[in-house]
Amino acid sequence: MSIQQIFAIRMNALAAFLLGVSGVTADATAADAPAAASAATAAPVAGTPVAGAPVASAKKSSEPIVTGPVAGVSGTGDLVLAEGGRTTSVVVVRESAGQWEKRAALDLASYIERIADAKPRVASTPADVAAALANSNSVPTLIVGQAALDADPTLKTALQKASTAAKAAPLLRIDAVAIRRVGQRVYLAGSNDDSHYYAVSELLQRWGCRWYMPGEFGEHIPRHPRLAVGQLDYAYASPFEVRRYWLSWNGDTTGQQEFMRRNFFNEEVVPNGHNLAQFTKELIPPGKSMFNVPISEDRTADHVAGQLEKAFANGERIQLGMEDGIYQSDSAADRQLIALQYDKYFLTQSYTDAFMTFYNKTAQRLLAKHPNSRALIGFLIYSNITLPPVKDITAAKPLVGYFAPIDFDPIHGMDDPRSKPRRECRDIFHRWAKIMQGRLVIYDYDQGMLVWRDLPNPSHQAFRHDVQHYLKAGILGVDTESRGAMATTGLNLFLRGQLLWRPAIDVDGLIAEHYTSFYGPAAEPMAAYWNAIYRVWEETLATEHEYFLAPAIYTPELLATLRARLADANQRLAPLAGRGDAASKRFVERLRFVSLGFAVLENYMAMTRAAATDTDFAAAVAAGERGLAAREQLTAMNPTFTTYKTIGEHGYAWWPGEVKQYQELLPLVNGSKGQLVAKLPLVWNWRRDEKDVGVKENWFRQPIDLAAWNSLPKPIGPAERWALEGKWEQVSADLYLQAQGVLGPDYQSYTGHGWYQTDIELSGAQIAGPLRLKFPGIFNECWLYVNGEMVAHRPFQGVWWMNDYRFEWEVDVAGKFKAGKNSIVIRHHNPHHFGGMFRRPFLYRAVTP
């Protein structure tokens, strides 16, 4: 069943809102409304996949979402906890309870009050607990944590069975919960302090409580005048030992701890970060850096093991991750190992065999002295040690690897036929899982765009598929690096928590439910709004990351769809404006959140179009400043919505830096430093040169033959482009090549040499004076030819992100053009990811100040 179908069913719960908002009462939500007559399905969405693209098969989840005023199977014997604003129920918890065990009891009482207008008493002193348990045959009693385990010791057996079913031999921990109703008693317990809270969260979620984002803004607490527990005997344990996220870039942590427990995250970690240099600094060769130490030599293992021995003997968890960079060793032993394979992603030799030799040697030395130690050594599988080793290596038992595939497609799932990089990542992952014998944690990036622009960046479309691979491989779990920034990440963390706890959960059901509970009367247009975004991310052929791909996702067609849906949503919520009840205020606030997010998105894309497509830098600066102002409003609304305030945004990689770049380009065309002579064409001819024969065959002088291209039916997809077999085709200068469908037959981004060509008519007046050709955005090493003559060469670091983030190239072309028709040819070499132009070039004449 699709999200749209599920949503249509759930819309039946919204009739009171959709037929007349006057029925909204204080603290009521959409969940209270009686059935509606019908609901419209989502409208057609812009941004459909390029013609000829394969479609990924969706793995359907098997566990439906069941919520309501009765937790468990309802019947005549339901245990009523609260009704009509009254309750006699008691929550029992030990006085000596742990932090989250105690918080679980307090939150349970608090949320029951918010759901049913009646707050149970909390008994925690020994005398109060004893009295509550003595009266539990006549009074509804909810017993939390160790108190439940003491009152019903058979719960321990249930927890153990659930734990064994999830993982027979856990390495770090197991998180299990048990919820059982016996007569007037409801037992809620877990296998540890966190799990006691998970048990309470399980119960609350059965009543319909949700925590979509940290803090009060992100929670949905339904209203039930009668709250009960039916027949209920449930025990469960997550198959993943590590279910953690942390906030990088100084993201705002407000509400994080509660959000984590309510969505079943834990804080389990084996330290793995960049710290190797502190143990190898004495081994740095003269005149070299920490990246030049010998790696696989015995002396390195001896040196490091000696420093770790005390911690290892004490059974500690030891951090031993590579430094954040590219290693280059001159050791003869290392050179022999790194010669085994080349890493095409990092454009250097793979150091995995050398590092795994080092890690195993170090671990073996420590184990030889302390064979019974329970110590663990964490390290990163990252940078140029991402590829599995060539040699047949099994990791020594103390080693725990954190697999951090930072430079792989972050958009698609591992089985998606549209992404060769992700399918390669899948195979790499499974190989590492075998090498590590399951002692593997995914170092998960969310959002995966890294340097981004506060635009929606959903990632559940990939994670929901990948988590099934993690389950199959039996790894330890997932450790997510997020920056919070909820306007960007949205439901990503919520869905991660739910999937890591229960991999079979119905993701589509959770998303559909979110619309009704979060947006109330605006649920229908908001479903269409967000489903449009999700669909484009799901179906895009783009596999790259960072803000350059935004125009490939957020097309004018998609923006028009979103604008219309947002207008519809605002119209539906208009009657709620100014109302004082909490529910109305929440719905209005959430729609304002979406509206400000759209203002950020719309203005950023207007800026991009003005600069990249129209060469209108004044308009680009104005749109960029409007977008940044909208972002300020979004941040003022809630500091968890963005992160830029705390990290600072210095340099051209960031949005203010991009606006600054356009401010610096503006004088070149407005007469202060230069006069615009001509915008080069937006559409260029382009040709693959896989065998690098173009120079030898004088492609820079040959006439352009577009016969094959012109014969193709439109629209043209990647398969049709590939079928041209290297003949001339056409591309746009305002978007990098891969996002236009310039791919290999397996949907791998095209790498290698390519040729751009265009003609431009210039008058004698236009070619006079100090003429300069400006490429405001172009990747790769390039060679420029004008009228068959090579006039400039542009060097470029192979890995694109190691270059100046302006990605500009300016060439003095005075005297190179003639009056009349001129040919401009660019030869470029793309070894990695992004290829070609992404901002339209222009000719300008320099003006003397």
Model-identified regions with their sequence ranges:
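Acidic, contiguous N-terminal accessory segments
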Residues: 30-36, 52-178, 227-233
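Feature activates predominantly on carbohydrate-active enzymes
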Residues: 96, 104-107, 111, 158-360, ...
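Structured mid-domain segments that build the active-site/substrate or prosthetic-cofactor binding neighborhood
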Residues: 292-302, 310, 420-522, 528
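Acidic, His- and aromatic-enriched active-site or binding-groove loops in soluble protein domains
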Residues: 340-359, 395-415, 499-507
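Substrate-binding cleft/loops of secretory-pathway carbohydrate-active enzymes
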Residues: 378-407, 454-459, 486-493
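Catalytic domains of carbohydrate-active enzymes that cleave complex glycans
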Residues: 474, 498-683
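Extended carbohydrate-recognition surfaces in non-catalytic/accessory domains of CAZymes
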Residues: 667-776, 794-809, 823-826, 830-849
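Short strand-turn-strand beta-turns centered on an Asx-Gly dipeptide
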Residues: 785-791
